[in-house]
């Protein structure tokens, strides 16, 4: 892990999310280090279920809006997730985005909301167990993915974070087999 850097800052309330994220990105070399002009960047939120922001179950919309504003300086931000249920459909995603505040975050930041429920098989040549996997198509087609996890406890884990949130790139119920 040599050369990897982590930035940690106290953020006592979500009203400071954008300022703190800007501070972090600047400390890591600026957004131009991560986004090239014209790129389409997926903001992979943790949208476990249709729960309001105050429930602290999903990525907070202030964090998604802040990330989208930073991406928008050079590219296009697209908010997405693939909930764990069998109904990964546009109508379900629409309700999920409304209830979690992601629709408002997109409106406030200029981000797009992704309703594409199609899948793609991607090659994993360095994989030790899997050499390919099915993922949601927007992930395979994006120029980059910014992971916006929600730090919380989990029934199968002590806590969840960035790696666990990436289970959301697997379509619908296929996540179950990977747990």
What do the predicted segments below correspond to?
Residues 1-179:
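N-terminal and secondary-structure boundary signal
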